[in-house]
Regions:
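Conserved, single-site charged/polar hotspot
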Residues: 1-302
Length: 302
């Protein structure tokens, strides 16, 4: 792999806020030479409208969906709820730290590029725009993971990455272009061998499911393909370098496999890394490996 496209998830001290007194957020413990940002790195900055308290912690207006109100909370407090929402709080320490870094990266990228759909909020607990959130799931392990990675985000060329992750790679990660139909360059996403834990659930590593003809027709329509009449054939399109299918062919007509998966139910069709596809007597049978889009960090690999 060329060095130009190789990313070892640079852990920048990226939430330095030079516009405010005491604004530097130093991680604890101090990062070693393998992870700290280069001396000449242009570190990403918080938007100017984000307030930083006297301890250097960004303060966010968070719309809490379950309570239908906006709460003011420090970034690290918000991240605790996100981490508990995205990963089980009894998982290994290093896995929690990795997820915390990605969660913080997601927040910084969101604040830099987007606005919350909720008026007066910087971000929310609504998974339609942000990350899962579970304040009740926060325990000492969660707090420690957030504290020990304080200020750390994953960067590529001094910019926060799009912090994609998935549950299980099925043995191969994928690029954002293929795994997510992403239209912009994201060279830090690569096809690599997965390193999933042997303790991962069997139905995440390998899965099988079935769908009715009506479900397939509706999913195709939701994914942008309107079928006239019933279904005669269902086939897998070409595979990318990771082995994932880019398109599903319904009566010979292509539809994005990623969009079809979301439309038909991503908790049943768990990935596009298909190992079997067959249509007979009004039933679509699918089997595959992995859980999720396969882009970025595998949680069971972490």
């Amino acid at each position: 792999m060329k060095k130009a496209v190789l990313l070892s998830f640079l852990l920048c001290l990226a939430l330095a806020c030079t516009a405010c007194a005491g604004g530097d957020m130093q991680p604890s413990p101090t990062p070693d030479a393998a992870t700290e940002a280069p001396q000449d790195a242009n570190l990403p900055q918080l938007p100017e409208d984000i307030r930083v308290d006297q301890n250097g912690v960004p303060v966010l207006n968070v719309y809490v969906q379950s309570e239908d109100k906006i709460d003011e909370m420090g970034l690290e407090e918000y991240l605790g709820g996100v981490l508990a929402g995205e990963m089980k709080n009894d998982w290994p320490e290093e896995a929690l730290k990795a997820q915390a870094i990605l969660a913080r990266t997601f927040v910084l990228k969101f604040l830099m590029e987007k606005k919350s759909m909720y008026e007066g909020a910087d971000i929310s607990t609504d998974i339609r725009e942000a990350q899962a959130y579970d304040a009740e799931g926060v325990n000492e392990r969660i707090r420690a993971a957030v504290k020990d990675t304080r200020g750390m985000v994953a960067c590529y060329q001094n910019e926060p990455i799009y912090a994609w992750f998935h549950a299980h790679s099925g043995g191969k990660t994928d690029t954002a272009e293929n795994g997510l139909d992403y239209q912009q360059a994201a060279p830090y996403t690569q096809v690599t061998d997965g390193n999933e834990s042997e303790s991962a659930p069997q139905d995440a590593a390998q899965w099988s499911t079935q769908f009715t003809e009506a479900e397939v027709i509706q999913a195709a329509a939701d994914a942008g393909l309107k079928l006239d009449g019933g279904i005669e054939t269902v086939q897998a399109g070409a595979k990318d370098d990771s082995g994932r299918v880019g398109e599903i062919l319904l009566n010979g007509q292509p539809v994005s496999a990623n969009e079809f998966r979301i439309a038909i139910g991503s908790t049943k069709m768990k990935s596009t890394l298909l190992t079997h596809i067959a249509y007979s007597d009004g039933t679509l049978a699918l089997s595959g490996r992995g859980y999720g889009h396969g882009v970025g960090m595998s949680q069971w690999g972490a």
